[in-house]
Amino acid sequence: MENPVIIYVISDAIGETAQHIIRAVTAQFSLNKPADIRRHAFIRDENALLETLEEAKAADGIVVQTLVQSKLADYASNFCVKNHLQNVDLLHTLTAAVEAKTGLKSKQDPGNMRRLDSNYFDRIAAIEFAVKYDDCKDPRGLLDADIVLVGVSRTSKTPLSSYLANQNWKVANVPLVPEIPIPDELFQIPAERIIGLTTTPEKLAQIRKVRLKSIGLDEASSYSSEKRILEELEYGYATFKKLGCQVIHVEDKAIEETAALITEIITSYH
């Protein structure tokens, strides 16, 4: 097939979930051209729905719907049957199964989906925040952060910031380097929002040597020397003491495990 498969996502919310599912499915096919996914979000009445369905009909597309209200879902399904369009209703087959199993009726409230959408936008904002204030690019961001991670180089500050951002936390991080002054803003925020990250000298040396090798530099650089590492770690501990913050050892911990410890500490203060 020379022309791409055209798929219309019709949703009374954002339609992001349907789009993810479609991409997962189409990835299983050796298509000459990527599927053309056309997302129509916030379809809340029959007029808007009909306009979108007519467009899908003209393009001979596949309709994938996530319409919470059964009235609109039925309207879309009937239109597709009459016009010989392939139609996939992602919500109502499962909704019917849950209703049959529980004896309860679906609320059919798109507002519940909107609340999920709000959560989605909060997550995107948190991710953008983490990127903007990574590595203390702008110290002013420390004042607005939910969590501030502090530690010497290669103690997982950036990956932890990204992971926590995906859980809707606004995270900034500050690298500790003996020759670089600590930003004043770090002393202007409550200590309970700051987490110090550290590790063992042996583990840090190992990680830094791997890093140097990966970028084509000499593994014997002072960056990975025992003397330099001990100096930095001691500076880190002195800084943590000044800040009065909690400290986590990250050696031999997965990012998920360290992130769980961080959120446990942060939420314990609220």
Swiss-Prot record:
Any single Pfam family the record assigns to this protein: Kinase-PPPase
EC numbers, comma separated: 2.7.11.32, 2.7.4.27
Record-listed ADP binding positions: G151, V152, S153, R154, T155, S156, K157, T158
Entry annotated with the keyword Heme: no
Domain of life (superkingdom): Bacteria
One of the record's GO molecular function terms: protein serine/threonine kinase activity
Keywords linked to the UniProt accession: Kinase, Nucleotide-binding, Serine/threonine-protein kinase, Transferase
Similarity annotation: Belongs to the pyruvate, phosphate/water dikinase regulatory protein family. PDRP subfamily.
Function as written in the Swiss-Prot or TrEMBL entry: Bifunctional serine/threonine kinase and phosphorylase involved in the regulation of the pyruvate, phosphate dikinase (PPDK) by catalyzing its phosphorylation/dephosphorylation.
Protein name: Putative pyruvate, phosphate dikinase regulatory protein 2
Organism of this sequence: Listeria innocua serovar 6a (strain ATCC BAA-680 / CLIP 11262)
